[in-house]
From Swiss-Prot:
Heme b b566 binds at H97, H196. One of its GO terms (cellular component) is respiratory chain complex III. Pfam families: Cytochrom_B_C, Cytochrome_B. CDD domains: cytochrome_b_C, Cytochrome_b_N. Binds 2 heme b groups non-covalently. The cytochrome bc1 complex contains 11 subunits: 3 respiratory subunits (MT-CYB, CYC1 and UQCRFS1), 2 core proteins (UQCRC1 and UQCRC2) and 6 low-molecular weight proteins (UQCRH/QCR6, UQCRB/QCR7, UQCRQ/QCR8, UQCR10/QCR9, UQCR11/QCR10 and a cleavage product of UQCRFS1). This cytochrome bc1 complex then forms a dimer. It comes from the Eukaryota. One of its GO terms (molecular function) is ubiquinol-cytochrome-c reductase activity. PANTHER family: CYTOCHROME B. Belongs to the cytochrome b family. GO terms for biological process: mitochondrial electron transport, ubiquinol to cytochrome c. Disulfide bonds: none annotated. This is Cytochrome b.
Length: 381
């Protein structure tokens, strides 16, 4: 009798995706973050569902409904902080996952990579709208500042902003629609994840060398299921340490003050995972220019396959580009720091220099170093 795992129409799909999947024998721990992102998404959907049972998307009751969840609902505080800090874990895993793809040249899987870029935009949109829901000061002013950026679009800008707001300011209509979108988007993300995996399994996983690994494959289960399980335990340990000991470490104290349209907080800033993009936005004095730079700072990932000049896929054996890569990582950390600082000297100039170097490294220096390395190896024509 043949195994049901290999014959049942539904179980067969799971088998080919997570059990009998041929995987390269040499993929390192940097490949663990895909499964961790899946876990983060599941945590967010489950905790979010329970929060939605008690939350009310009305300007008069939103803030107090979140307070009610934390004070009166059984383990409501735990669910709320797991959801809030789960988003931070999601973005940590996301940045490492993208960084891994950039380092080892995974962007040459064009379809998988482009779906990934779309996923990044969708996750960022979801996180932004989720931050608005508690209706604290930073929620309100963050929503006002970021949605207002769309008014920089010529001709249709103002109309577009008022259409998104559902009025002439961020108000009840805005909160209600943000809640609706925040609820539906994770399910769209889950569908996109399936497409992401579908395209990935067409080609198979990349590996640290960037070379074809068809000659040396091992089954996903038990080798990588056990390896992923270690990552899962470490993620849960890190998340629960954050939730149970430092729940507000990554949040903003201003969000414990109910939203007040008549009182602007001294420093409006988004959550930490958006600070790098926020710093790039602020470093350009022109409004439209800032918005374009903001979008391009993420969209630039979609251009990586076209900026690849080397005959080698991975950076494993490319020391010059390796140095540039880690300069880019350091640069992003500087941008994240600057995004949280007030707009004054010396932060303005540091932010502008970091923004210039961010685009320069990706668009100019890395493609040039790829050509130089090929020449040094006498591989160029």
């Amino acid at each position: 009798m043949t195994n049901i795992r290999k014959t049942h129409p539904l179980i067969k799909i799971i088998n080919h995706s997570f059990i009998d999947l041929p995987a390269p024998s040499n993929i390192s721990s940097w490949w663990n973050f895909g499964s961790l992102l899946g876990l983060c998404l599941m945590i967010q959907i489950i905790t979010g569902l329970f929060l939605a049972m008690h939350y009310t998307s009305d300007t008069t009751t939103a803030f107090s409904s979140v307070t009610h969840i934390c004070r009166d609902v059984n383990y409501g505080w735990l669910i709320r902080y797991m959801h809030a800090n789960g988003a931070s874990m999601f973005f940590i895993c996301l940045f490492i996952h993208i960084g891994r793809g950039m380092y080892y040249g995974s962007y040459t899987f064009m379809e998988t990579w482009n779906i990934g870029v779309i996923l990044l935009f969708a996750i960022m949109a979801t996180a932004f709208m989720g931050y608005v829901l508690p209706w604290g000061q930073m929620s309100f002013w963050g929503a006002t500042v970021i949605t207002n950026l769309l008014s920089a679009i010529p001709y249709i800008g103002t109309t577009l902003v008022e259409w998104i707001w559902g009025g002439f300011s961020v108000d009840k209509a805005t909160l209600t629609r943000f809640f609706a979108f925040h609820f539906i988007l994770p399910f769209i993300i889950a569908a996109l994840v399936i497409v992401h995996l579908l395209f990935l399994h067409e080609t198979g996983s990349n590996n640290p060398t960037g070379l074809n690994s068809n000659a040396d494959k091992i089954p996903f289960h038990p080798y990588y299921t056990i390896k992923d399980l270690l990552g899962v335990f470490m993620l849960i340990l890190f998340l629960m340490t954050l939730v149970l000991f430092f729940p507000d470490m990554l949040g903003d104290p201003d969000n414990y003050t109910p939203a007040n349209p008549l009182n602007t907080p001294p420093h409006i800033k988004p959550e930490w995972y958006f600070l790098f993009a926020y710093a790039i936005l602020r470093s350009i004095p022109n409004k439209l220019g800032g918005v374009l730079a903001l979008i391009l700072s993420i969209l630039i990932l979609a251009f990586l396959p076209f900026l690849h000049t080397s005959k080698q896929r991975s950076l494993m054996f490319r020391p010059i580009t390796q140095v540039l890569y880690w300069m880019l990582v350091a640069n992003l950390l500087i941008l994240t720091w600057i995004g949280g600082q007030p707009v004054e000297h010396p932060f303005i100039i540091i932010g502008q220099l970091a923004s210039i170097s961010y685009f320069s490294i990706i668009l100019i220096l890395m493609p040039i170093s790829g050509i130089i390395e090929d020449k040094l190896l006498k591989w160029s024509l």
